[in-house]
Swiss-Prot record:
<dbReference type="InterPro" id="IPR020977">
    <property type="entry name" value="Beta-casein-like"/>
</dbReference>
<keyword id="KW-1133">Transmembrane helix</keyword>
<comment type="similarity">
    <text>Belongs to the TMEM54 family.</text>
</comment>
<keyword id="KW-0472">Membrane</keyword>
<keyword id="KW-0812">Transmembrane</keyword>
<protein>
    <recommendedName>
        <fullName>Transmembrane protein 54</fullName>
    </recommendedName>
</protein>
<feature type="transmembrane region" description="Helical">
    <location>
        <begin position="22"/>
        <end position="42"/>
    </location>
</feature>
<dbReference type="GO" id="GO:0016020">
    <property type="term" value="C:membrane"/>
</dbReference>
<feature type="transmembrane region" description="Helical">
    <location>
        <begin position="155"/>
        <end position="175"/>
    </location>
</feature>
<dbReference type="Pfam" id="PF12304">
    <property type="entry name" value="BCLP"/>
</dbReference>
<feature type="transmembrane region" description="Helical">
    <location>
        <begin position="62"/>
        <end position="82"/>
    </location>
</feature>
<feature type="transmembrane region" description="Helical">
    <location>
        <begin position="100"/>
        <end position="120"/>
    </location>
</feature>
């Protein structure tokens, strides 16, 4: 008998779970770098608690960093789970972290959309608060401006756009990872019937496989 998970063999299921975890790790690192760049190029000049808009920028950036860390952790856990599928605590860890990733990424995406909308609505005044002239129409370097006002507006929107795309991608792959671990846990409210299907194989072809592979004597329950 051969164990199948969601229409996939155990080997294919492991590969899909591992690739999903790798994608989450990569996305998390890129998202973390993007948030760090935004902090270094923008927030260190405009992050003043007195300005509500600037404070909102800081909160969204902190949320982006937190989301990136959780995404990386969830991706690593998914990779480990692809090697140790029978571990029930690890299954629950990956499932809960994936759900947390999806929620954080969605919240982060909404926050980034709000930041972009507020920047357009205020014409970037919060970004130029550190400059004495305080107007986005004066696109020239000023002695009392600690940065180049001709670039901070476009740089902020560019970094926010990249971060928004990353958050959406993180949400998609986090949901996919949660779906895969959901199949392992056999939680019925979403899929109804069990996702485990049995298929007969030639006993000679299954010799030498590990405990999670097909066996000729009895089906294996994860």
């Amino acid at each position: 008998m051969c164990l199948r998970l969601g229409g996939l063999s155990v080997g294919d299921f492991r590969k899909v779970l591992m690739k999903t975890g790798l994608v989450l790790v990569v996305l998390g690192h890129v998202s973390f770098i993007t948030a760090a760049l935004f902090h270094g190029t923008v927030l260190r000049y405009v992050g003043t608690p007195q300005d509500a808009v600037a404070l909102q920028y800081c909160v969204v950036n902190i949320l982006s960093v937190t989301s990136a860390i959780v995404v990386i952790t969830s991706g690593i856990a998914a990779i480990v789970l692809s090697r140790y599928l029978p571990s029930t605590p690890l299954r629950w860890t990956v499932f809960s972290s994936s759900v947390a990733c999806a929620l954080l990424s969605l919240t982060c995406a909404l926050g980034l959309l709000a930041s972009i909308a507020m920047t357009f609505a205020t014409q970037g005044k919060a970004l130029l608060a550190a400059c004495t002239f305080g107007s986005s129409e004066l696109l020239a370097l000023a002695p009392d401006c600690p940065f180049d006002p001709t670039r901070i507006y476009s740089s902020s929107l560019c970094l926010w756009g990249i971060a928004l795309v990353l958050c959406v991608a993180e949400n998609v792959f986090a949901v996919r990872c949660a779906q895969l671990t959901h199949q392992l846990l056999e939680l019925r409210p979403w899929w109804g019937k069990s996702s485990h299907h049995m298929m007969r194989e030639n006993p000679e072809l299954v010799e030498g496989r590990d405990l999670l592979s097909c066996t000729s004597s009895e089906p294996l329950t994860l």
